[in-house]
Amino acid sequence: MIINKSGGTASSQGKTYRVTIPNSWIEQLGIDEENREVELCFDGANIIVRKKQTLQEYQNTHKQNKLLQLKFYHGDTLCTTILADETDKSVLIENHTDNPLYTAFGVQDDPDWQDYCDFLEERCIPKSRAGLHEYLTAIGVAEYSPIEIIRKTQGRMAEDQAWLEVTEL
């Protein structure tokens, strides 16, 4: 572990930490100068470095689970593809625009399951809305379930041009 004092605008107590990883490990991950995007995960006890998965790789490794694909559009433009694994409660996204105003999760590139659930709730009628039961009956949904409401309404809201397409994989 290499420990250095931080520079720039960091506090006088600020430090940076670097770890050197053996070449053989990097080669096994398939990381090279052109494909070097990785994810760092910390579970409270372990730091995990892994190659960032593509949507196809994620779909292949989660194919035994209940997997949904949501495509988030602004008008006719596809802005974000979301893969949501309802079995293990994980999410992977790919943004198709650089404008965070039009992406499903704004500037956040690595949403977790709670972020995904919050996003779904934002795209449908609030659970506390008066007349909720009548609304659900009118659209043919038995109980409050954001994903089921979105399947019926495409997550369309009066104040924007965003909408969702949901597919079971």
Residue ranges and their predicted role:
Residues 1-169:
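Phosphate/dinucleotide-binding and metal-coordinating scaffold of catalytic cores
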